A protein has these predicted regions:
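Conserved AAA+ ATPase core "coupling" helix
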Residues: 87-89, 171-230
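Contiguous, well-ordered alpha-helical segments that form the cores/surfaces of helical PPI scaffolds
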Residues: 1-4, 263-273
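Conserved ASCE/P-loop NTPase catalytic core
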Residues: 1-189
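Conserved AAA+ ATPase small/helical "lid" subdomain
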Residues: 209-264
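C-terminal engagement/docking regions of AAA+ P-loop ATPases
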Residues: 17, 23, 247-259, 270-324
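Non-catalytic, well-ordered alpha-helical scaffold segments
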Residues: 22, 132, 173, 177, ...
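Phosphate/oxyanion-binding loops and surfaces in catalytic or ligand/nucleic-acid-binding neighborhoods
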Residues: 31, 35, 201-205, 291-295
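Conserved hydrophobic residue
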Residues: 9, 143, 203, 274, ...
Length: 324
């Protein structure tokens, strides 16, 4: 859904070790269609969005130059836990400074992730200063760097994706609230599914080329479906009745702010586009509500029920299941 609408706000995936969280995120890169950027731009600037150009591209426009375009693969950039501030935000290119006596800015991970995905494995173990950097960039959509006499301002709009094991620590509330969706992944308990997983992994390790050939057709089908959904998503309609019920749901659950309603409506629209529908129905809303709200509810230490159970209870009242 985030691949269809980046405004959903990303996703955090929490679950036990070895459940395929990281594998699923890294596999996303091969599904994403290419985009256009300004030729040679280190910040992946969109030539059709003049208000979101880096300083270099703005200077070229002011000089009357035409911003040529080139296709590029949508990036899925991984942010390691031990990354430094310079690695994330960018820094002075020391090699050129020493050998050529010129000051050149070397883009960081935020620049590489612009118009793509920024992935953090074990996000709940992320250092506090990195969390603050991400919160600033996520809030403004820009990264401003002041280094050794260099001042650089460039766009940093990315979809934030995190994964982690809840047993290793909790995620800071400020960062958790920035994620649009929250997904729990559990270990597969069905015997046939476990056998299939082991068989696929064994096949891949023994003969990866044959395995890729076997899965190529299904992969191509997913790519085509994603492209069709991308063309359709902006035209999918959400009726006032559905929006009113979404708002009622959030009011009854005492959700703070309005990110809950916005996330549900955007995620439901993306899901409807994926299904090939022209408008959002109540089934779409039911499908995305728990993952949109379960990390936003106020926590009561005396409450014995899971947040997801509380959401489902109110959801059944506002959006009752229609049985035929």
């Amino acid at each position: 859904m985030n691949a269809l609408d980046s405004h959903i706000g990303g996703v955090v995936i929490m679950g036990h070790r070895g459940t395929g969280k990281s594998t699923a995120v890294r596999a996303l890169a091969d599904l994403l269609p290419s985009k256009n950027r300004v030729r040679g731009c280190l910040f992946n600037c969109d030539p059709d969005q003049e208000r979101e150009l880096c300083d270099n591209c703005k200077m070229d426009l002011q000089k009357g130059l035409t911003l040529e375009r080139e296709p590029f693969q949508v990036p899925v950039v991984e942010l390691p836990l031990g990354a430094t501030e310079d690695r994330v935000c960018g820094s002075l290119d020391l090699e050129k400074a020493l050998t050529q006596q010129i000051k050149v800015f070397e883009p960081g991970l935020l620049a590489r992730a612009h118009r793509g995905f920024l992935y953090i494995d074990e996000v709940n173990l992320l250092e506090d200063f990195l969390v603050d950097l991400l919160l600033d960039a996520a809030a403004s959509g820009w990264n401003q760097v002041e280094r050794e006499g260099i001042s650089v301002n460039h766009p940093a709009n990315f979809v934030l994706v995190g994964s982690g094991n809840p047993e290793e620590g909790e995620l800071r509330p400020q960062l958790l609230d920035r994620f649009g969706l929250f997904v729990r992944v559990t270990t597969v308990s069905n015997l046939d599914d476990r056998v299939k997983i082991v068989g696929n992994r064994d096949h891949f390790e023994r003969d990866p080329y044959t395995f890729f050939s076997k899965m190529n057709s299904a992969q191509k089908d997913l790519q085509k479906k994603l492209k069709r959904a991308l063309k359709r998503v902006t035209s999918v309609k959400v009726s006032q009745e559905v929006i009113r019920k979404i708002a009622e749901l959030c009011v009854r659950l005492q959700v703070d702010g309005h990110r809950g309603e916005l996330t549900i409506s955007r995620a439901a629209r993306a899901l409807a586009a994926w299904k090939g529908h022209e408008s959002v129905n109540e089934s779409d809303v039911r499908r995305v509500t728990v993952m949109s709200l379960q990390h936003r509810l106020r926590k009561d230490p005396l409450e014995q029920f899971e947040s997801s159970d509380q959401i489902k209870k109110i959801l059944d009242q506002v959006f009752p299941l229609v049985t035929k």
